[in-house]
Amino acid sequence: EFHINACFLNRVFPSTIMKLIEKRDKSQGVSILVAPYISERTAQICEDNGMGYFDYAGNCWFVGHSIYLSEKGNKNPRPKEQRSVFIFEKTSVVSSCILRELFADVTKIWKLKYLSEKVNCSIGQVSKLMKVLVENAWVEKMPDGYKVIDPESLLLEWSKDYGKKEITSY
């Protein structure tokens, strides 16, 4: 007998999958995640924790009951729908200032008010950025503020977008 426990989500973030992994009961069979799109980082978290996944782009990874499936590298068929916040773009000056401040001391626990005053922006802008950082498991919300928990991954993701060149044609 072979049981598969599937979790279907409209949107998935690394923080979401980490919570699912914590809650799952391994004795109840193999767990899989199904979502419209699963990022490379989320996929890696799934694989590292033995959780299968399938997305609408055709990316998948599944190991269970003598079955092995793996397909990677397919692009997101609807990228604009999945990425509503462009925090890393060069045009996101405020986000860039906040991120630079966070990287000044990644061991520190940051308060929204302090960050907003330090970079001269609204608390709402800082809060919006922190929400995205928490969803992606780069920052953790603590009782007394926010702490960067995965600076390497955050910096890598930021550098991917920040390094893109704009192409202008006339």
Regions found by a protein language model. Give the residues of each.
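DNA-contacting interfaces and partner/effector-binding or oligomerization modules
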Residues: E1-D48
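A structural signal for short, well-ordered beta-strand segments and their strand-loop junctions
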Residues: L33, F54-D55, E140, K147
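Charged, structured surface patches that assemble and position nucleic-acid processing machinery
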Residues: G50-F62
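Membrane-interface helix-loop-helix junctions at boundaries between adjacent transmembrane segments
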Residues: G58, V85-I87, Y114
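Short, charged, surface-exposed secondary-structure boundary motifs
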Residues: V63-I67
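Short alpha-helical segments that sit at the start of domains
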Residues: L69-L99
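Short, amphipathic alpha-helical interaction segments positioned at domain boundaries
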Residues: K80-V85, E152-Y170
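Loop-centered beta-sheet repeat module
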Residues: S95-E157
